Amino acid sequence: MKRKVLAMLVPALLVAGAANAAEVYNKDGNKLDLYGKVVGLHYFSDDSGSDGDMSYARIGFKGETQIADQFTGYGQWEFNIGANGPESDKGNTATRLAFAGLGFGQNGTFDYGRNYGVVYDVEAWTDMLPEFGGDTYAGADNFMNGRANGVATYRNNGFFG
């Protein structure tokens, strides 16, 4: 019985992506976090465009600074590195997120840059699966539905009550 469990556990651990985060700096209201994720992924498909190695790694930084009692500045940068192509293929690396913003305490946040559009906030409730999640209408570089460039967003968690 132990061998069967071990035989199932080892492949599951090899397939699962690892996500980690580390606090680089946190002092006097200033905070900087480093995070990352490595995913080994292989698709088996009759479609030659989606068959094969889809492995990738992501690295990012999140920062925040306390400007005043109810006033903060923040930013985030996240980069995707495709591990499934040659170095000459520049199409599999891209900046996923790059934005800066201001937080106004209980009154919400305002940011600008490459970020998720506000429609994604609603769609994110279905984007929970590790693969094929949130595929209803979200996509990268699709205005307000997914990640896009030049997006100004206002978010407030307590707006409707």
Curated annotation (Swiss-Prot):
Alphabetized UniProt keyword annotations: Cell outer membrane, Ion transport, Membrane, Porin, Signal, Transmembrane, Transmembrane beta strand, Transport
Membrane topology: Multi-pass membrane protein
Signal sequence bounds: 1-21
Source domain of life: Bacteria
Record bears the keyword Nucleotide-binding: no
Cellular localisation: Cell outer membrane
GO biological process, one term: monoatomic ion transmembrane transport
Main location: membrane
Signal in keyword set: yes
Name of this protein: Putative outer membrane protein YedS
Originating species: Escherichia coli (strain K12)
Lineage of source species: Bacteria, Pseudomonadati, Pseudomonadota, Gammaproteobacteria, Enterobacterales
Gene this protein is translated from: yedS
